[in-house]
Amino acid sequence: MKKVITFRQLFYMFLAISITPILTLIPADLAVGNSSSAGISVILSLVALIPLALLIVVFMKAYPHYNFYEILVELFGRAVAKVLIAFYGIWSFVVLSTKVWQYTLNLQSSIMSNTREQVFFVTMMILVLYAFLRGIKTIFRFAEFVLVPMLIILFIYILSAIPNIRLDYIKVANTLTFSELCGQAGYIIAAAGNLFLILIYGDSVKDHSKSGKLIARFLIATIALFLVLLILVTVVTFSLVGNNASAMISTPFYVAMKGISVLNILEHFEAILIIIMFLSDFLGICLYASISMRCIKWACSVRKMKFLYIPFAVFIYYLALVLCRTQFDVEYLYNTILVKWNLIMQYVIPFALIIVHYSKIGVTSTRMQRVEVKSKQ
């Protein structure tokens, strides 16, 4: 595999695809409580995010230039690795179909309410197919190119909203139990779990020789920026429209920004948010389409994948229509099934893998010690 991706591009991609969930799904899910409970949930999410970051560092250092499938082969052998990859492939199909729906609903609920979902599906698939023909390197470079402008615009939105903040909306004591707070933290953890997916591209990273300090630095900065942006967006959203209203809106931050002006000069510029969410959705769909194709490649031992692009696009089109029919179906699928499934695929299985990794190291070191003892005898 050609080394075409840098660590910076990997982490930029994670932040870019996280923007839409930060603006839509997570504030709506955290709105069950209030700003105080949301802050506590963010802190609780670190209990999972910090170990996940350490896990990524361990795997990157222990298996340099290995992708996720090759790591599984090293730990379990080829047969078990193919079964696990098939499981990851099914999961990525469902996530991809859900992301296509979420992108569609974001546009329908904001500026194109009378447009049929099939139009959005086909439009996105054409764009993704074009991106795939340009190559995965181009997709990651595009994420690197658009992330900084997206973040600058979001911070301008947040600063512009400060004069309109209602403190009585956010100065509320937490009323949720610890188990409910953990449930809210689960939504944050499920979105942040995309960090684990960088292991999928371990064989494509250019600068693996610098992995130790470089990965740690990028991980700390990425997680910190993710959480800071999440806190700011959630607090601003709750302080403008209230947590009760946020819970009932699919795009709460977009609604909160309506009527906000910059220096009393620029007004009604919330439409730029639609472009930002579209770019984030586009990159997220590209990423999960790439992961799905890689899982097919590894599970079926296929070398060339271009002939599968159009059949796979048609498959995802119909899978999305079969899985969901309405916004209620999408929300039910995500909140009831997909969040828990994400936690299993991005946390439970990886942490099980790290246990197997260290147990194999322990067995190997024990055998080496026995060999040394016998040789001395």
Please provide the spans of the model-predicted regions:
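Membrane-water interface regions at transmembrane-helix termini and the short interhelical loops
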Residues: V32, Q108, M125-V146, S204-H208, ...
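Membrane-interface interhelical connector segments
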Residues: L240-E270
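Hydrophobic alpha-helical segments and their helix-loop junctions in multi-pass secondary transporters
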Residues: F93-L96, V100, F132, P149-N174, ...
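Extracellular loop-to-transmembrane helix junctions
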Residues: D29-V57, N335-F351, I361, S365-V371
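Hydrophobic, membrane-embedded alpha-helices of multi-pass small-molecule transporters
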Residues: I5-I26, S41, S45, L49, ...
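Membrane-interface "cap" regions at the ends of multi-pass membrane proteins
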Residues: M1-A28, N34-S36, S204-H208, S359-Q377
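Membrane helical hairpin/interfacial module
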Residues: L23-A28, V32-E117
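Selective recognition of specific alpha-helical transmembrane segments in multi-pass small-molecule
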Residues: L44-L55, G89-K99, L127-V128, V148-I162, ...
